[in-house]
A protein has these predicted regions:
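Charged catalytic cores and adjacent phosphate/nucleic-acid-binding surfaces used
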Residues: 1-69, 81-95, 112-124, 130-146, ...
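Active-site neighborhood of divalent metal-dependent phosphoester/pyrophosphate hydrolases
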Residues: 74-79
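Hydrophobic, aromatic-enriched interface-forming segments
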Residues: 169-207
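Short acidic, low-complexity segments enriched in Ser/Thr/Gly/Pro
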Residues: 144-160, 166
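A conditional alpha-helix N-cap/helix-loop micro-motif detector
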Residues: 53-54, 169-173, 343
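Surface-exposed cleft-lining segments at the edges of enzyme active sites
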Residues: 158-171, 333-338
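Conserved N-terminal catalytic/coupling substructures associated with nucleotide/phosphate chemistry
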Residues: 288-413
């Protein structure tokens, strides 16, 4: 919770000879390709199975930036509602700024969006559930209108009533091959999601004919396969299976990995539920753009993608603050319960910071950096209760921005 107080041209020819012989201009030097990090399978609170519905869209972008990602795709279940909500939030802040009606807290939020989006390419998309429950990622250029993507989902027979629900179960929709074709024809990247696990088109554990599996993984309209074992080695990996060495699977398939994140940060090292940037693919690009990415994903040079094996960990901003310790601009409270005077202590700190240089108050975590934080149960409800209390107890109400942050598997305010 943050408290905020009040004409010389370059490139001339070296000269012409007396016979006016033209001098050929040198073509501009192309930038050297660089390895870029991408996570093309991220969910948001726009998916109804998202595990932390109180997380903001800005939180997700911040985490992606903190993990060193260059490209992400928002791929909620059978909807683009999450991406649309993020887009609408940014547009609203820009509108307020353009009319001089933006308050300091909103300005800080907009500035943070600008900072993150200046470094991060965010692509719209969806995770479509085809017939028999198979999952397919469709990823599109950033300028693609939300209405176009919603029309595409309707074309794929997602029921209109469920178009903004973010549900992974939407009844009888289009089959896998039709979905591949429709998404590809619409200009999207077509990636079969987590093919070697649940809802994957490898159909493990399902009694389907071999020709169906071949068609679902070799169709010319599918550009890549997302796998969960890309970093494993040996002869039994999914990438080895689809390397073109099998007569029945002659087309070598590009295999990439994505986090399929349904939460901001992985709860523990053994949890199967990954966070943003926990499974990353590196891609060699001349520039960070959808066009450059599409050129690689649709191409045949499989050496241009590889699993990212870096050791970068998610930044725990709360723990960093605890290690710095309490100060005039930083305070910690293990709980906001009224009993024991905890809420009153929080209000005193708010009042003090509002009348000085501002600061940040962390609720749900003790100041001792070695103590395990308890966190705040139902953060969204706690934030609303705190807003109500501030409105009742202060006049004028101090400018306070209240957010939730993850730390050590729990959430603080």
């Amino acid at each position: 919770m943050t408290n905020d107080p009040g004409s010389t041209q370059r490139g001339r020819s070296r000269g012409a000879t007396q016979s006016a012989r033209p001098v050929a201009a040198r073509p501009p030097k192309r930038p050297s390709p660089q390895w870029r990090r991408m996570d093309l399978h991220l969910h948001t609170p726009g998916s109804n199975d998202y595990q932390e519905p109180y997380i903001s869209y800005l939180d997700i972008l911040r985490q992606a930036s903190a993990r060193g990602l260059d490209i992400i795709a928002i791929t909620d279940h059978n909807t683009v509602a999450g991406y649309a909500a993020m887009q609408k939030e940014v547009e609203q802040l820009l509108w307020l700024e353009s009319r001089g009606r933006i308050d300091p807290l909103e300005q800080r939020q907009l500035d943070e969006y600008r900072r993150v989006l200046d470094k991060l390419l965010v692509l719209p998309g969806f995770e479509f559930t085809a017939t028999f429950g198979f999952h397919i990622l469709g990823i599109f250029p950033p300028e693609t209108p939300v209405s176009y993507l919603e029309h595409l989902l309707l074309t794929l027979r997602v029921p209109p009533a469920l178009l903004r629900e973010g549900s992974s179960t939407v009844g009888a929709t289009s089959d896998v091959l039709t979905a591949y074709h429709v998404i590809n024809e619409a200009g999207g990247l077509v990636i079969a999601a987590h093919v070697n696990s649940g809802n994957g088109v490898m159909m493990r554990g399902l009694d389907f004919g071999g020709q169906t599996r071949v068609a679902y993984t070799q169709d010319p309209n599918v550009h890549a396969l997302e796998v969960t074992d890309l970093e494993k080695r040996g002869n039994q990996t999914t990438r080895r299976f689809f390397d073109g060495s099998k007569p029945e699977y002659p087309r070598p398939m590009r295999c990439i990995q994505g986090s399929d994140a349904h939460r901001l940060i992985r709860e523990s090292a053994t949890s199967p539920y990954l966070g943003v940037g926990d499974r990353v693919t590196e891609v060699l690009l001349d520039e960070v753009s959808f066009e450059a990415l599409a050129g690689v994903i649709r191409g045949n040079d499989h050496s241009l993608t590889r699993p990212y094996r870096g050791t970068a960990k998610a930044v725990d901003f709360v723990q960093l603050a605890r290690e710095e310790g309490e100060s005039l601009v930083q305070a910690f409270h293990p709980t906001m319960n009224q009993r024991g005077g905890h809420l009153d202590n929080i209000l005193r700190d708010i009042c003090a910071m509002a009348n000085t240089n501002g600061g940040t108050i962390y609720i749900g975590v003790p100041a001792d950096a070695k103590a395990k934080p308890e966190g705040v149960r139902e953060p969204a409800r706690a934030i609303e209760a705190l807003r109500t209390t501030l409105a009742k107890r202060f006049s004028p109400e101090p400018p306070v921005q209240i957010d939730s942050l993850p730390t050590q598997g729990t959430t603080v305010v």
